[in-house]
């Protein structure tokens, strides 16, 4: 006959009983929660079936396995209730499918209005003018007219040399008075205020573009002149390096010329 003096067997027996009771309670709670979730899903399906078309309802009856609801926990239900306000504007899906997205105004694609008329912007004389309902053909015609008017404008236009002289004088005045800031700003404003005709600008550009063409024929002549100067200087260097030979050459040339003169003179 065994006796438990310390009472260890009673404590172990009590702890085992407590564990079994806790496990049984957890299993019962889990079974109740799953059962309640299934009942809630079925009631949801039957509640929404009144709003379903007859064809969808018949499909749900024909294929019950495709529309089964799984176990829904209390946390998911709380999340749906908490964030349900964000999906009020979304179109709900009846049985299964993807999660509906909220139709926020910033997510709506912006479609450009087809009735917007083309505009034409003109910059002229420091002003900006905008015209509506201008087709591309009209815009091209306006640009052609402006180009023809710019080429045909001849009134109140100064010659090119006068414009160049005035432009060079302004640059000279600006460089001479660059020491004082007041005179520099005065000259700058004077240069800015003096108008230059469009024809003068075009003629200046044409003259600058035509200048290299006029210089092309003078290039060979300049080369010939530099070559002649080079040969002349080389000849001078050679003559200065050998003066005695030059004297001998001069004497020989003088004697030969004297002999020729004596031979040709009558006796």
From Swiss-Prot:
Compartments where found: Nucleus
Membrane-crossing ranges are none
Nuclear localization signal, short sequence motif: residues: 222-229
Answer yes or no on keyword Transcription.
yes
- PROSITE patterns, per database record: TIFY (PS51320)
Swapping residue 235 to A leads to an effect described as: No effect on interaction with MYC2 and nuclear localization
Residues in domain Tify?
113-148
Q: What post-translational events are described?
A: Ubiquitinated. Targeted for degradation by the SCF(COI1) E3 ubiquitin ligase-proteasome pathway during jasmonate signaling.
Q: State the Pfam families in the record.
A: Jas_motif (PF09425), tify (PF06200)
- The reply on keyword Transcription is yes
Q: What induces it?
A: Up-regulated by jasmonate, wounding and herbivory.
Q: Which residues form the signal peptide?
A: none
Q: InterPro entries of this UniProt entry?
A: CCT_CS, TIFY/JAZ, Tify_dom
Keyword line: Jasmonic acid signaling pathway, Nucleus, Plant defense, Transcription, Transcription regulation, Ubl conjugation
* Short sequence motif named Jas, residue ranges: 220-244
Function, in words: Repressor of jasmonate responses. Jasmonoyl-isoleucine (JA-Ile) specifically promotes COI1-TIFY7/JAZ9 interaction. Interacts with and suppresses RHD6 and RSL1 transcription factor activities to negatively regulate jasmonate-stimulated root hair development.
Domain description from the entry? Answer: The jas domain (220-244) is necessary and sufficient for interaction with COI1.
Q: Which family does it belong to?
A: Belongs to the TIFY/JAZ family.
Protein name per UniProt: Protein TIFY 7
Q: Which species is listed as the source? A: Arabidopsis thaliana (Mouse-ear cress)
């Amino acid at each position: 006959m065994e006796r438990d003096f310390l009472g260890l067997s009673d404590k172990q027996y009590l702890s085992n009983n407590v564990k079994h009771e806790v496990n049984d309670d957890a299993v019962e709670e889990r079974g109740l929660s799953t059962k309640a979730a299934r009942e809630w899903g079925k009631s949801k399906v039957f509640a929404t079936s009144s709003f379903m078309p007859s064809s969808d309802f018949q499909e749900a009856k024909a294929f019950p396995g495709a529309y089964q609801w799984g176990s829904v926990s209390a946390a998911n239900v709380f999340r749906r209730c908490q964030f349900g306000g964000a999906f009020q504007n979304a179109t709900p899906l009846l049985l299964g499918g993807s999660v509906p997205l909220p139709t926020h105004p910033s997510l709506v694609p912006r479609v450009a209005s087809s009735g917007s008329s083309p505009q034409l912007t003109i910059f002229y004389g420091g002003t900006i003018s905008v015209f509506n309902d201008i087709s591309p053909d009209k815009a091209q015609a306006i640009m052609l007219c402006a180009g023809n008017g710019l080429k045909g404008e001849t009134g109140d236009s100064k010659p090119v040399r006068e414009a160049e002289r005035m432009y060079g004088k302004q640059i000279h005045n600006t460089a001479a008075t660059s020491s004082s800031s007041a005179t520099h700003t005065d000259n700058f404003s004077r240069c800015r205020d003096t108008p230059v005709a469009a024809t003068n600008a075009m003629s200046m550009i044409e003259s600058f573009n035509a200048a290299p063409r006029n210089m092309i024929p003078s290039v060979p002549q300049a080369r010939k002149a530099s070559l002649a100067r080079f040969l002349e200087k080389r000849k001078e260097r050679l003559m200065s390096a050998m003066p005695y030979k030059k004297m001998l050459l001069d004497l020989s040339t003088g004697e030969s010329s004297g002999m020729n003169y004596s031979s040709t003179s009558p006796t």
